[in-house]
C-alpha cells in the first residue's frame, strides 16, 4: 500500500538530520554511492548547463553536478520535505554556491522552467503514482539533446528475497513499502525519449534509466 504524500513528507522531515548517515549504512550492504554518481555522469553535463534535480533531499548529488556545470551553470533542487530542503540549504551555504535554487514542491505538480539541459532523480520515483506524467513533462522541458537520468529501485530478479525483505524493512522509516518497487519508469523514458539506456545493478534491484530529449 502506497503512503500518502503527507505521510512521505512527514517521514522525511523526521529523518532529515540523519539521512546522510543512513545512506552510509546502505553502503555497508552494497548499495553504493557510485550508482548515484553514474546517474549524474549519464546526464553528460557541460559548464553553464541548467539542471533540475527532482527529489534533491539534502543535496548529496549537488557536488558532482556543480563540479560539471561550474559557477556559470544553474542547479534547481526540488523536494517535498521542508526539513530536507533546509539541510540542502545548509550544504549550499557551507559550499558557497551562488547558483543553486531550492524549491519546495510536490514533484508531480512541479512546473519545469524553460531551457533545461539535464533532469536527475535518485531514489524518488517509486513514490510517484503519476510518474509517467512527470517524465513526459521533463521531456518537454529539456532542450533538444538534453538528458534525463533516473536511478531507483525495482523488484529484483537475481537478489535473494531475504536481502530484498531486509532492505524494505530498513527503509520503512523513509516510507518505503513493497509497492515502491512496482513503478516501471523506464517504460515511460523509452516512450518519451530517444537514445535510451537501461542499466541494472545490485541483483536487479537498482536500475538507472536514461535518455535524450528529441
What are these regions (language model features)?
Residues 132-144:
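A short glycine-rich, Lys/Arg-flanked "PGG" loop and its adjoining helix->strand segment in the class I
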Amino acid at each position: 500500500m502506497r503512503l500518502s504524500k503527507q505521510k512521505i513528507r512527514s517521514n522525511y522531515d523526521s529523518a532529515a538530520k540523519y539521512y546522510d548517515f543512513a545512506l552510509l549504512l546502505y553502503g555497508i550492504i552494497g548499495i553504493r554511492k557510485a550508482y548515484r554518481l553514474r546517474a549524474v555522469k549519464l546526464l553528460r553535463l557541460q559548464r553553464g548547463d541548467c539542471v533540475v534535480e527532482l527529489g534533491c533531499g539534502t543535496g548529496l548529488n549537488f557536488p558532482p553536478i556543480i563540479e560539471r556545470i561550474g559557477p556559470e551553470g544553474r542547479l534547481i533542487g526540488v523536494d517535498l520535505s521542508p526539513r530536507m530542503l533546509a539541510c540542502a540549504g545548509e550544504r549550499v551555504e557551507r559550499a558557497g554556491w551562488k547558483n543553486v535554487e531550492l524549491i519546495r514542491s510536490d514533484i508531480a505538480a512541479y512546473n519545469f522552467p524553460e531551457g533545461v539541459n539535464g533532469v536527475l532523480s535518485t531514489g524518488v520515483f517509486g513514490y510517484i503514482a503519476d510518474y509517467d506524467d512527470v517524465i513526459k513533462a521533463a521531456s518537454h522541458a529539456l532542450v533538444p539533446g538534453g538528458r534525463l537520468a533516473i536511478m531507483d529501485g525495482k523488484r529484483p530478479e537475481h537478489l535473494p528475497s531475504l536481502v530484498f525483505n531486509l532492505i524494505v524493512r530498513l527503509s520503512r522509516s523513509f516510507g518505503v513499502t513493497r509497492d515502491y518497487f512496482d513503478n516501471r519508469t523506464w517504460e515511460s523514458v523509452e516512450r518519451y525519449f530517444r537514445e535510451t539506456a537501461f542499466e541494472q545493478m545490485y541483483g536487479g534491484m537498482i536500475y538507472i534509466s536514461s535518455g535524450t530529449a528529441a
